[in-house]
Structure formats: C-alpha cells, structure tokens
Amino acid sequence: MTGLSVRSARSAPPPARHAATPPRRWRRVTPWLYLAVPLIMLVTFTYVPVVSMISYSFTDWDGVSPDRSYVGLDNYVQLFTRPELFSVFATSLFYLVASFAQIALALYFAAVLSFGTRLRGFFKGVIFFPYLLNGVAVAFVFLYLFQPGGTLDQVLRLVGVDAEILWLGNPDLANVSLSGVSVWRFMGLNFVLFLGAIQSVPSELHEAAMLDGASRPQIMWHIIIPSIRPIISLSVILGVAGALSVFEIPYIMTGGSGETKTFVIQTVKLAFQFNKTGLASAAAVVLLVVILLITWVQRRLVPEERTPST
C-alpha cells in the first residue's frame, strides 16, 4: 500500500501555477503605468493647448470676454493680405544666417577640441557656458555692451575707432547685432552635440586615415562629417525653428520695435497689447505649420540613414 501510494503521488500531474499569472499580467501593465503620468502631462500641456489654439484661430476672441464669434478663415486672410503682419518673417532671415554661422563655428570648435589640444576642458567650459545662462540675463549684459559709449565702443577706441556706433538704434545694424547675440548664446548647444557625435566615431577610422597620409581637414571632411550627418541635420532643424521663433533677446533689448520685430513678438503683441487673441492664434498656427513644413522638406532632402539589418 505504501509503495502504491508513493507511485500514484509521483504520477499525479503538478498543480496549475495560478500564482504566476498575476505577475505576467503586471509585466504587461507596468510599462504603461510608468508612461501614464508623462503622457497625461504631455496631452494636458501640449496637445490640448494646441487644439484650443487652433479653435481660437477661427474666432474673433479678445482673450478676455467669455463671448467669441466664429469668423471662419478671416484671421488667416488678414495674415496673408496685410503686408505689415506677414512681412516680419523677413527679420528671421538675419537669425537664419546666424544659425548657420553658429553651426559652422560649433562644428569647427568641436573638431579642434576633439583632437589632442591643450586646455581642452577649459575651452569646452568657455564655449558651453553661455548656453547655461538665462536669456534675460544675456539680453541685459549685451544691452549694456551695445549702448552708446558702452563696453564695445570702449574696446573699439583702443584699436583706433573713435566713433560711437548705434548698434541697436541703426536699422542696418540692429538685427545683425541681435543675431550675433543669439550666435554667442546658442553655439554651446550645437558644440556639445557635435563633440559627442565626433567622439562616438570609431578611433580606428582616424588611425587608418592617418596611416594613409590623410590630413586633419581631410579626416574632417571625408570621415567625421559623413559620420555625424544625423546630428548636423538635427542642428539645422533646431536652428531653423529657432530662427523663426526668436523672442526674448530682441524683445528685451529693443522691445521689438521697428525693423527688429519678429513674428513671435508680433503675435504676442496682437494677443496681449491689442487683445486680438483670435488673430494671434492664427499667427501661431501659421508659424507652427511653417516650421513643420520646413522640417519635413529638410528630412526629405537629407533622409535618415538606416543601418542594414543582418
């Protein structure tokens, strides 16, 4: 009897593992629990305001009154038929040129400091430090620098230039001066992106090229730039978007007056100074569409390289 009971106990099927089912379900749910809060915040603070902005662009809302009337495409017609509203995009050309100069300078410094250079850590900090500063602080520093008789004029006197130049008052120099400030402030971001990308290029490629007698400019042009092309493409997208959405530096330094008014400054003034929130919303929608369109064109012209699957 004892041997029979032992054999029957051994041949009995093991009990079903019901306890393993809940952990397996939790493994499927856990990633969504981690994503829930960021997704809720993203929808609440990004997509809902965008949808509200688009809906406001079809109304004549003044931003204060609870009443708003549907006006259809009238706000968009005003933007494209009133030259004083849409022509301010021309100011962005100065910042667009400055963004390409900024990318070129950042790429140059990243390439130089990626090789064996003395005091590399010091120069990296000097280049990246302006990006850490608050935009308002940067604007006030350069406001003092550019004022008549300010620091820049005093430096020019040391080299023999005795005339006081209206850096912000001269329409021919104001946007050049302001775009130069943006180059100084944002070059550090592109510099860090390029430096990290260059350092990720395999060192074997550098060594093989140097053994073949390639110079550093040749290594830069034929090895480094093709290897970091996705990062360069990202910097171009960020530069174009930044050039079209410039606000704080010209607004603080000149108040966005005259030829220094940008599209974003005009949009803010329409909403909060002239109480034309509907028209300002339409302007913001147009700016969003322009940036998305330029990004799409850029991605089509410079497609992302895909590594072949093995």
Residue ranges with predicted function:
Residues 14-27, 309-310:
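Alpha-helical transmembrane segments of integral membrane proteins
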Residues 1-19:
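Short, intrinsically disordered terminal tails adjacent to the first/last structured region
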Residues 27-310:
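A structural signal for multi-pass alpha-helical bundles of membrane permease subunits
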